[in-house]
Amino acid sequence: MTATKKIGILFGKERSFPMAFIEAINRRNLPGITAEPVRIDKVIQGEPSGYDVIIDRISQDVPFYRAYLKNAALRGTAVINNPFWWSADEKFFNNCLATRIGVPVPKTVILPSHDLPPDTSDQSFINLTYPLDWDTIFHYVGFPAYMKPFAGGGWKNVYKLHNAEEFYQRHGETGQLVMLLQEEIVFTEYYRCYCIGGKYVRIMSYEPRNPHHLRYEA
């Protein structure tokens, strides 16, 4: 008898996609395959997770889950997205990489956090010039511009800025977040690309102004 292969999905506040994904898998009645929300009651080093595949929708916000997923991957679970890429998967690095391989991206600069990070003082930043060269930064990016965290997603802490005065006001509200200032691109078409295993690619139309469940045209 073939052992059942379990697909788990790890998620947070969202409900529409995770539950629809689980229902779509189970509705197919594929022999030996079942899908469910990931259940975690303990995480012991080197022990398997009990899942053959885990779809990750939340570990970018929860360090505990990132550690859990890395342990699961080491024990043979296929984790989507790759948990070992998390440290490199931030917007500024991705933009820098794109510039090196010839992919057009919006003009972007990274900004130090407005407030000092924990356990630091002014003496921690003797290599950083204050004030920054704001004139050059604003001339390079232009206005309108968007300011957003350099890592993470979910459209959190994103600001549209029309001038330097708005920038200074909003930047003062961002606390210890490291932010990007990015050129506005007024798009006529918007696409997202999903790649699995560095091999399978799906390009999909995407409308970010729609409700979440109506954004993709797959």
Predicted regions and their residues:
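Active-site nucleotide/adenylate-binding loops and adjacent lid/helix of ATP-dependent enzymes
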Residues: 2-11, 73-76, 84-190
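Short glycine-/acidic-enriched loop or helix-start segments at secondary-structure transitions
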Residues: 19-20, 65-67, 91, 156-158, ...
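Alpha-helical structural motif
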Residues: 17, 130-133, 196-199
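Short, solvent-exposed loop/turn segments at secondary-structure junctions
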Residues: 14-16, 60-61, 86, 151-153, ...
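Conserved N-proximal alpha/beta basic substrate-recognition cap immediately N-terminal to
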Residues: 12-124
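Phosphate-binding core of ATP-grasp and ATP-grasp-like enzymes
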Residues: 175-178, 184-218
